[in-house]
Amino acid sequence: MARRSQGTKLHLAVLCLVVSCHAIGLSDLMERASQRSDKLHSLSTSLTKDLDSHFPPMGRVMMPRPSMCHTSSLQTPKDKEQALKVSENELISLARSLLLAWNDPLLLLSSEAPTLPHPSNGDISSKIRELQDYSKSLGDGLDIMVNKMGPSSQYISSIPFKGGDLGNDKTSRLINFHFLMSCFRRDSHKIDSFLKVLRCRATKMRPEAC
């Protein structure tokens, strides 16, 4: 019941966002998007810590390298200094491309979480669903933003996700689940950083304050 109530509130918030955002300024839209991306990154960090609490001893050795994340093919700024040099249109395109690239992986994580061999799989499953909700909410908000910014900001890179199975044994499932979450946490940080730079520009803040 609590989960349903929470989901209802979020969906109402999304509906209000879609209905009202067309009537508010771009800087306010940037602020709302930044708040949602911050929550997305915070949730992914919390999930990663949950997984760390029950990780196989050899997990760190066996887990794929970050370069194996399916979004690694997308060229993105490496830090804030580089992001500050990128145009608004490119930053919003990168944020939307990364967000869209995680639709299918989040579906996989959501389906695997309830039976994950982890003592906190119930909490993990709940947080994954929250990630999906906030990802959808953020995506809807960014769609409204690009409509205000014009056609040149609407380009999205297609990033295929080929993984559809976390493995059969317990160790493989834990490691691959953790790997995907680590990739998502990295990308959620990028999305949050890009949107904060956009927010700074919209509010004319000094670069060092971003």
Curated annotation (Swiss-Prot):
Keywords: Disulfide bond, Hormone, Secreted, Signal. GO terms for cellular component: extracellular space. The gene is prl. Belongs to the somatotropin/prolactin family. It comes from the Eukaryota. Residues 1-23 form the signal peptide. Pfam families: Hormone_1. InterPro entries: 4_helix_cytokine-like_core, Somatotropin/Prolactin, Somatotropin_CS. This is Prolactin. GO terms for biological process: cell surface receptor signaling pathway via JAK-STAT; negative regulation of gene expression; positive regulation of gene expression; positive regulation of leukocyte proliferation; positive regulation of phagocytosis; positive regulation of reactive oxygen species biosynthetic process; positive regulation of receptor signaling pathway via JAK-STAT; positive regulation of respiratory burst. Disulfide bonds join 69-183, 200-210. One of its GO terms (molecular function) is superoxide-generating NADPH oxidase activator activity. It is found in: Secreted. The keyword Heme does not apply.
